[in-house]
Amino acid sequence: MSKTTSIQWGETVIIADADYIDRVAFHLTVNFERMIGRHIPQADMAKWVECVALDGGCRKPENANTQNDEKTHVILVHENTREQMDNFNPGTFIAKEECDGKQLDSQAFSGPLGEFLFHCIPSNEQRDSLKKTDILSDLLAHMADEEQVKRIVLIPDIESDSDTLNSLIPVLRHLDREHSDKRVTLLAMQPLSGLPCRTEILGYSLLAALGVKAEEIK
């Protein structure tokens, strides 16, 4: 958490398990290449985070000529043994000297929804305080105290381990009770109900980032 304490947060924060979304993107690529009969390139990271921000409640200015000054922070939590996401472009968390510099950490881009800023945080399953689930819970709780944060989008891996969702629910309930002005959205591959937050389907944003069009799968 020390890496995030001095950051001036914007109105929207996306907190994602990077290893999970990379794995889902891989499975979607394999399945849909077979289904539509063409090669699918790596997911466009910029396109994906813009779609996720829309899922979380961000909207473009009504006047297309108006500059959007909103900031969205994207926090990618990943295993410390992994250097990159294989199914996203760009996908390198922190570039080494010999790389071409296309890393995600501390980088930003601007688009119709404003500026997107990336932060990559490594986890370590061998240390309790650095386990991915703990980091996700801590980040979510931290955002509750950040007044300027109005929208939070959470993308955990609840498929591999049901304890992940169980550990997040108390924080989600706290946000729902004590910070009801914040819009919290959880993205998952399957519909969810009974959670103290909004839910959306993760697959839609990933398919858009992979360039799969609706007419191709009808």
Q: Model segments located where?
A:
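Acidic, polar low-complexity linker/tail segments
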Residues: 1-10
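A charged nuclease-like catalytic/ligand-binding cleft shared by nucleic-acid processing domains
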Residues: 9-23, 30-153, 162, 196, ...
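"Short basic amphipathic alpha-helical interaction patches in structured regions
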Residues: 28-30, 169-170
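Cofactor-binding loop segments of dinucleotide-utilizing enzymes, especially the Rossmann-like FAD-
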Residues: 80, 157, 189-191
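Eukaryote-biased recognition of electropositive, low-complexity segments
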Residues: 119, 167-218
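Short basic/hydrophobic patches in alpha-helices and adjacent helix-turn junctions
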Residues: 141-142, 159, 173-174
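Acidic, metal-binding active-site segment of PIN/NYN-like and related structure-specific nucleases
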Residues: 152-171
